Amino acid sequence: MTISNDKEFKAALAALDDVGRRQAAARLVQNVLDLSNDPRVKGALSLVARADASEAEIDIAAAAVKTARVESFTQCGHDTDWKSQAAHFVAVAAQECVKPSVDFASAWNAAGQARMARICRNLAEDGEGTGTREAEAQFVTLTAFLKESGS
């Protein structure tokens, strides 16, 4: 199955179990890691992309990502610094991936926050905020994940 729109994307996310949704969401957020230089976010996503991550490891990663999210929010300031805003959205997306259970809403929120991060970066670079390219990249990423995992 090749995913080509949000309806198919949502259906594919919904069909996965919690572990599969966590791994898929982590991959989607990893696509926007170039927008964040926070090692806590990167480390947490690397952890939860693995099927064998323990609950204790995920709990530690969740605490680290929460701190990163709070710190990134305070860096956004009032001047609409789009690059800082992008990094904040990456942290918010990562936080969805380190919840104790990643249900459909969490995975979908992670995807949406990743799209928002890319929109912010696009605004910072050229004044054009579009999430279409990121959505299309997510379709490709989720399709590849489903093929690799046999889902």
Q: What does each model-found stretch correspond to?
A:
Residues 1-151:
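Structured binding/interaction patches within domain cores
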